[in-house]
């Protein structure tokens, strides 16, 4: 069933969207949110495991990001399979299969075991590459930005993780948490299957997985990969990193640090729908361009480490201390989370507009780039911290990546004509 049936003579914006489309959107968003809770759980569990296993910052980064790697690598094949078999089937199978490694986490005792299991568990992170093309096919082009923004709000699972996981950990111990989440995946699979509908685009696009790489010849794909590596990669990495940052930098408890960290994750999730609506209204380029500038300013302020100045005056010496208060940190990360949300939504508005016939494949490739960013960044955060011994180096790194994005978008989209004198 296509959304245009019965409305062929109407303008796209005036066409009635079937109730089934909204049901698919709601079911897909729920499934994605639950998957994201599971995908991000090591951001909280890892703090406890770091103490139990005696991990350094680099090992902690590796622990939290291993599952992100698999989620990134699986986005391309799952995006291709979604085009071939349909999002309903692929999402349901993914939820059921991933419940097994999630449950097995509760039996791990050594770092290498967590890493190996995390590789299998991480497949839940590829659910985004399934849901995005699946949902988009039920909506007309003029409403896809909003629809994909609502679906993308499933990343609120990062905030749900920050609220729920610490409470479960304190109440029952960390080994019970993955068992509860495994059951949640199975229950979600049943709900999703009952509330969703057959994919209208299933089976319409053939070709092998190798054929999917042909779209890499288009330079627009590479540009979108770079945008998404900072928007989604930065969001994912900081969602994993900020709880322990707050705990160590400001001496908070894990529950308190996780609650404050939600000030970043929550807007980075729920405002994604607004980012999609703004992309529909003003275009993906405008939202991406101005969002990057806001991120650049926020990261510049967050990058500055606590510093003591000694000033020599005619009356002696005067001390000046500069540091980021908790309120300032929460406010800036709130803004950063919001612009990352806008950036994630605008990137896939680009995808829907520029690649309507290869949406599943391009979604998988761009999602792969974002997931790789989410995998590499926590490890780099840990390496920089172990080397420089300055916690704000994580924001310094992101600041540099945003600079690259701004230069790239200026050269390829803003400066459309040569400068003449």
What are these regions (language model features)?
Residues 285-347:
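C-terminal transmembrane helical hairpin of 12-TM major facilitator-type secondary transporters
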Residues 73-111:
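Conserved MFS/SLC helix-loop-helix module at the cytosolic interface between two early adjacent transmembrane helices
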Residues 42-43, 219-269:
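Extracytoplasmic gate region of multi-pass secondary transporters
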Residues 117-154:
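Cytoplasmic helix-loop-helix junction between adjacent transmembrane helices
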Residues 23-57, 238-243, 377:
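Extracytoplasmic
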Residues 144-163, 367-377:
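Glycine-rich segments within core transmembrane alpha-helices of 12-TM secondary carriers
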